[in-house]
Amino acid sequence: MPPSPCARCHDQRAVIIRPKNRQKLCRTCFLHVFETEVHETITSTSLFHPGERVAIGASGGKDSTVLAAVLKTLNERYNYGLDLCLLSIDEGIKGYRDDSLETVKRNAQQYNMPLVIVSYGDLYGWTMDQVVAQVGKKGNCTYCGVFRRQALDRGAAKLGIKHVVTGHNADDVAETVMMNLLRGDLPRLSRGTSIVTGSAASDIKRSKPLKYAYEKEIVLYAHHRQLDYFSTECIYSPEAFRGSARTLIKDLEKIRPSSILDIVKSGEDMALLKKVKSQVLGTCERCGYISSQRVCKACTLLEGLNKNRPKTAIEMEIGLEDEESSSTLRRQMEKVELGGV
């Protein structure tokens, strides 16, 4: 059987079958179509404005690496006028994050973008290796998720940046829809499906330019552009519930390729059924960070961790309930050094 021609240009030989719609494309057309679809997502939602400073949440993985490469390309091609930088979080996981950060550092040079790295150790006095040693692997993702969200916000705030973009893709959003549907949690489903998100605890805007991009196509894009990315999964991330949702979605995708986007669209429709009430923002009485509660989630988790530490080890951290401890942590948070810019 002769090779199939590209369905778009009809000149080159097709080398890719798009997972999204089974369309056969040559390398050049696939890359252009992928970039054009991301551009359409950005423009149709008015995601950016000229002159905006935007931090790309960079982990060194395929999603954030592709996001950085595509945004750089589109920023130059369509003259978005964005000031882009890379913002990475060092959770303190030896053999994983230290290696992936080396990839991010190379990306910063390859894309000519400033890089800022914020560490859990500097912000909270705990690395994830230490957290796991204390609480075990079960439930450690809760700590990491809360700490990472606040670390991204703190890093962006230190830079004077009000917009952070992340590499969440269509598969991620579909999994979130499925999990929250099974939980019966419409408010969380609404937050998870929106292309622009944030939280009651932050005035930092977060968005997902790759929201409608399939994970498989992100891998194909990275491969055909020969992007430099880190492919090892986090050693502490079992994600039992999300893993079950992922397996179900992958099985549906095999039967019906459009299933992923169908689930995303259904989630968007369901999100309209319940209006999420806005919360009143204040500041955490311990660390001074924006919070809808008297004590923010990060400080609540840190209090539990620090109860098992000797007093001498936590005098400069959260855990002491007197006023001096709270002001000490606030000063510590304010003095975090952010290099690279």
From Swiss-Prot:
InterPro entries: CTU1-like_ATP-bd, CTU1_C, Ncs6/Tuc1/Ctu1, Rossmann-like_a/b/a_fold, TilS/TtcA_N, tRNA_thiolation_TtcA_Ctu1. GO terms for cellular component: cytosol; cytosolic tRNA wobble base thiouridylase complex; mitochondrion; peroxisome. Its EC number is 2.7.7.-. It is found in: Cytoplasm. GO terms for biological process: protein urmylation; tRNA thio-modification; tRNA wobble position uridine thiolation; tRNA wobble uridine modification. NCBIfam families: TIGR00269 family protein. Belongs to the TtcA family. CTU1/NCS6/ATPBD3 subfamily. This is Cytoplasmic tRNA 2-thiolation protein 1. It comes from Aspergillus niger (strain ATCC MYA-4892 / CBS 513.88 / FGSC A1513). The gene is ncs6.
